[in-house]
């Protein structure tokens, strides 16, 4: 807890939720195909009202001031983009939420993007729940850039510290994480 008070800060509250509800030790295969003894599934936190509120306020502080939308790859980013857009509205800031599909819609317009689409050239911040190698985030970034949007930043809840930052930098992206995996793992009793 913070030294000045016995009441945990929002950052400490969120760290506690992630450590107790999202983090597991064991033998896991990640979405990247890699094996790991650490697993982080943020959905038990991001799909709870109070957890999403904590995440959204924290992520909003890292969305570029001139961004007009936040976007992310479905499914992990779905609650994040909606929550951050709502947190922005609470501060009288217009910020739309976009969902990037994993593949083009098979019917209707065949759209990759869902939501109120801004004008081409608009700055969009990409949101992610967990970054490992950066593959999911980069897929979202490429779809947005192909649609004519400017993307320079990815904000994630957790950076697993497995090369995602280097992959982002190679694509001229800044990666900002609310937490590093090492910070969450250190918070959990052995």
Swiss-Prot record:
Signal peptide range? none
Source organism superkingdom? Bacteria
Q: In which pathway does it act?
A: Pyrimidine metabolism; UMP biosynthesis via de novo pathway; UMP from orotate: step 1/2
**Positions that bind 5-phospho-alpha-D-ribose 1-diphosphate:** 101-102, 105, 107, 128-136
Q: Which cofactor does it need?
A: Mg(2+)
For this protein, what is the EC number? 2.4.2.10
What keywords does the record list, in alphabetical order?
A: Glycosyltransferase, Magnesium, Pyrimidine biosynthesis, Transferase
Where does this protein hold orotate? 132, 160
Q: Which InterPro entries match?
A: OPRT (IPR023031), Or_phspho_trans_dom (IPR004467), PRibTrfase_dom (IPR000836), PRTase-like (IPR029057)
Q: Which reaction does it catalyse?
A: orotidine 5'-phosphate + diphosphate = orotate + 5-phospho-alpha-D-ribose 1-diphosphate
A GO molecular function annotation here is: orotate phosphoribosyltransferase activity
Listed GO biological process terms: 'de novo' UMP biosynthetic process; pyrimidine nucleobase biosynthetic process
Q: Which HAMAP family match?
A: PyrE
Tell me which family the UniProt entry assigns to this protein.
Belongs to the purine/pyrimidine phosphoribosyltransferase family. PyrE subfamily.
NCBIfam families reported in the protein's UniProt record: pyrE
Q: How does this chain assemble?
A: Homodimer.
Tell me the function of this protein. Answer: Catalyzes the transfer of a ribosyl phosphate group from 5-phosphoribose 1-diphosphate to orotate, leading to the formation of orotidine monophosphate (OMP).
- Protein name in UniProt: Orotate phosphoribosyltransferase
Give the species this sequence originates from.
Synechococcus sp. (strain CC9605)
Tell me the name of the encoding gene.
Answer: pyrE
